Curated annotation (Swiss-Prot), chain A:
GO terms for biological process: ATP synthesis coupled electron transport. This is NADH-ubiquinone oxidoreductase chain 4L. The chain crosses the membrane at residues 1-21, 29-49, 61-81. The keyword Transport applies. It comes from Ursus maritimus (Polar bear). Core subunit of the mitochondrial membrane respiratory chain NADH dehydrogenase (Complex I) which catalyzes electron transfer from NADH through the respiratory chain, using ubiquinone as an electron acceptor. Part of the enzyme membrane arm which is embedded in the lipid bilayer and involved in proton translocation. Keywords: Electron transport, Membrane, Mitochondrion, Mitochondrion inner membrane, NAD, Respiratory chain, Translocase, Transmembrane, Transmembrane helix, Transport, Ubiquinone. Coiled coil: none annotated. It comes from the Eukaryota.
Length: 98, 606
């Protein structure tokens, strides 16, 4: 296995840890989510290009599309929380009410 | 014979002259009220000729003028029946109307539409005459509806006032309910006797007359404000005082009683309807007398007094004494119209004050009105040898000695004592004591129009009973012998009412303020009858229609069944099922620890 995969895999792990461990801002976990998506994109592109996996040439672009959608979703949730509370502190979300 | 018929025709035609001459614009003349008044006075004088002819020769006339149309087998004509009832009632009604018109020249003097007012009064009088002299049911119905319409127009005379419009509408609606009974009776007579003429109806022997007589009883209930259809009469006091004096005391409200009196040959043999009439009349007289005990508006007290006397007339019909009821109609017209005119004089002098709690001390200030009021009150309660005595005492005596319903008799006696009680109340609050009105008014009764009209009715209240009673032909034999206590019963009950009321009224001067108790509240709110009937039924129908139209169809079926119910259900179930508390960081941390643990466990297992 080429060493570059280890590098990209490490980037993914770093972003994952950053997603799961954060202090107060919801925005930082969303950014780490983007980081995860980015590393996945790079890994997928490198794999497809190195192995001449021609039929999977579309896969990175599709991944990007879905990443964009989920980023938009996450941002809209952040904006809704921020509209209600003024900040995006995650400790505000301790009150679930329907 | 010629004198009889020509006098009657001249009387009736003279009354229509001021109306027909509208095209010659006499009604824009300033002295049109005087013209109408003198017309009515001349009509009265001419109509006494047939009355005297009838009293001294017993001559009855039927004038059958004009054949209008024949509808298959029904012949409709214009015919006048001038028998005992109509020939005596016409002069009485015309006399009272003459006095009231003279009074209303004074009362409505500052009204710009006084000519219009007199035209309405005259039209009312004409339709009342049509009703009284009708020989067939169609003509009677024309007169019946005519007095109803004129009552509506006259009650709502001051139409800028919302209460007056409501009262006029109430009068029309309640009268309409009675008209249903009238039309039912007309239809029954058309189907079963093929005629609307009284002669033919009375000549045929019928088997079961319950339906038409019940219809006529319903019509009398509506027109004469018996219990169940009574609220319009106290509300009709929104009209001017001359209207109250003419329509709602002497003439229009007796139309229902007059109808029942006309049909006495049919009612003589029908015990069911007589019992129903008796109970209805007894109920009415007691209820309205109880309501009159606590009213504070002088016109409403007199209106309830009218209603109570009408109940007494209906009771008289119920014990099969139509001629006594008719006598009471004639005598009652005099003193009741006079009572209303006195109240009009008081109201006008006190600058339109109608509340008796704000009157007082008028004994020395308005001497003639005071005299007339006291004599009217005494005549109303049946003081021996005044007018009311000849009819009222006879009625009570006959009721006491006849084989009748004991409850009805008892209620009539109680109502008689209540009559004395509320009459004492009027006298006490209006005339006696210290004045409670504004000091800065001019109390003046010095107008010849007012004085002459009240004096005329005053003489009538004192002497008319004697004159009428001793000149009419005896129709039913009055009960001559009865135990002493029964003979004295009416007088004793009246004295009891007087004394009790006087005591109570005197002691109210020295009481502390007490909150009203339930019987008081019952009496002053008219037995809760108008409140329940006028508001409950419309509220129920309107709220039911609102619920059906907007809530059932729109809200429920279109809005709530699928869309809102789905969202509501989802929300409720998610609240029930979810038990999270929103500790996101903790959840993420546990996720990460799980990942690390799994990494270690799965990689270093060996």
């Amino acid at each position: 296995m080429p060493v570059v995969y280890v590098n990209i895999f490490l980037a993914f792990i770093v972003s994952l840890v950053g997603l799961l461990i954060y202090r107060s801002h919801l925005m930082s976990s969303l950014l780490c989510l983007e980081g995860m998506m980015l590393s996945l994109f790079v890994m997928l592109t490198v794999t497809v290009l190195n192995n001449h996996f021609t039929l999977a040439n579309m896969a990175p672009i599709i991944l990007l599309v879905f990443a964009a959608c989920e980023a938009a979703l996450g941002l809209s949730l952040l904006v809704m929380v921020s509209n209600t509370y003024g900040t995006d502190y995650v400790q505000n979300l301790n009150l679930l009410q329907c | 014979m010629n004198l009889f018929t020509s006098s009657i025709i001249m009387t009736l035609l003279m009354l229509t002259m001021p109306i027909i001459l509208t095209s010659a614009s006499t009604h824009k003349n300033k002295s049109y009220p005087q013209y109408v008044k003198t017309t009515v006075s001349y009509a009265f004088m001419i109509s006494t000729i047939p009355m005297v002819m009838f009293l001294y020769s017993g001559q009855e006339v039927i004038i059958s003028n004009w054949h209008w149309m024949t509808i298959q087998t029904l012949k409709l004509t214009l015919s006048f029946k001038l028998d005992y009832f109509s020939v005596i009632f016409m002069p009485v009604a015309l006399f009272v109307t003459w006095s009231i018109m003279e009074f209303s020249i004074w009362y409505m003097h500052t009204d710009l539409n006084i000519n219009h007012f007199f035209k309405y009064l005259l039209m009312f009088l004409i339709t009342m005459m049509i009703l009284v002299t009708a020989n067939n049911l169609l003509q009677l119905f024309i007169g019946w509806e005519g007095v109803g319409i004129m009552s509506f127009l006259l009650i709502g005379w001051w139409y800028g006032r919302a209460d007056a419009n409501t009262a006029a509408l109430q009068a029309v609606l309640y009268n309409r309910i009675g008209d249903v009974g009238f039309i039912m009776a007309m239809a029954w007579f058309l189907l079963n006797t093929n005629a609307w003429d009284f002669q033919q109806i009375f000549a045929i022997e019928h088997e079961n007359l319950n339906i038409p007589l019940a219809g006529l009883l319903l019509a009398a209930t509506g027109k004469s404000a018996q219990f169940g259809l009574h609220p319009w009469l106290p509300s009709a006091m929104e009209g001017p005082t001359p209207v109250s004096a003419l329509l709602h005391s002497s003439t229009m409200v007796v139309a229902g009683v007059f109808l029942l009196i006309r049909f006495y040959p049919l009612m003589e043999h029908n015990k069911t309807i007589q019992t129903a009439t008796l109970c209805l009349g007894a109920m009415t007289t007691l209820f309205t007398a109880a309501c009159a005990l606590t009213q504070n508006d002088i016109k409403k007290i007199i209106a309830f007094s009218t209603s109570s006397q009408l109940g007494l007339m209906i009771v008289t019909i119920g014990i099969n004494q139509p001629h006594l009821a008719f006598l009471h109609i004639c005598t009652h017209a005099f003193f009741k119209a006079m009572l209303f005119m006195c109240s009009g004089s008081i109201i006008h002098s006190l600058n339109d004050e109608q509340d008796i709690r704000k009157m007082g001390g008028l004994f020395k200030a308005l001497p003639l009105t005071t005299t007339a009021l006291i004599i009217g009150v005494l005549a109303l309660t049946g003081m021996p040898f005044l007018t009311g005595f000849y009819s009222k005492d006879l009625i009570i005596e006959t009721a006491n000695t006849s084989y009748t319903n004991a409850w009805a008799l008892l209620t009539t006696l109680v109502a008689t004592s209540m009559t004395a009680a509320y009459s004492t109340r009027i006298v006490f609050f209006v005339l006696l004591g210290q004045p409670r009105f504004n000091p800065v008014i001019i109390i003046n009764e010095n107008n010849p129009l007012l004085i002459n009209s009240i004096k005329r009715l005053l003489l009538g209240s004192i002497f008319a009973g004697y004159l009428i009673f001793h000149n009419i032909t005896p129709t039913t034999i009055p009960q001559m012998t009865m135990p002493c206590y029964l003979k004295m019963m009416a007088l004793a009950v009246t004295m009891l009412g007087f004394i009790l009321a006087l005591e109570l009224n005197s002691t109210t001067q020295t009481l502390k303020l007490d909150y009203p108790q339930n019987p008081f509240k019952f009496s002053i709110q008219l037995g809760y009858f108008p409140i329940i009937i006028h508001r409950l039924l419309p509220m129920m129908s309107l709220s039911m229609s609102q619920k059906m139209a907007s809530m059932l169809l729109d809200m429920t079926w279109l809005e709530n069944v699928l869309p809102k119910s789905i969202s509501y259900f989802q929300m409720k179930s998610s609240i029930t099922v979810s038990n999270q508390k929103g500790l996101i960081k903790l959840y993420f941390l546990s996720f990460m620890i799980t990942l690390i643990l799994s990494f270690f466990v799965l990689n270093f297992h060996e």
